[in-house]
């Protein structure tokens, strides 16, 4: 896997993620990527209902969420999370790249969209963009060099 500069919050702590996808493989793949970026997985969910519960429980810095899932789809879950937490950062990660789905997700509060299969360099740049001024690239210490 390609290496990337570590992304951290402005307070020096790791960016905390909630990863939501009904595919365990997809969740693990995305989790592996964000951990390589220096992130911390604080929760996982396989459907929109569980995503809402996990968001309330973990208050992550960012949610990476699939669109098509059982019980409640990602767009509806994103809308409900943003309604309760207006500053929530949600990035939709889906193979369903129809323009109407992307537009609907953005209208309901998602901040960005990443097409599956996820490319780590694209996910990294999207995370940097969505975190904005609340994130920084960690400067290596002498021990890490």
Can you annotate each of these PLM segments?
Residues 69:
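Receiver (REC) domain active-site loop signature in two-component systems and cognate sites
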Residues 47-50, 73-76:
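Acidic catalytic/metal-coordinating carboxylates
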Residues 58-64:
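Active-site beta3 strand of CheY-like receiver
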Residues 100, 118-127:
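C-terminal output helix
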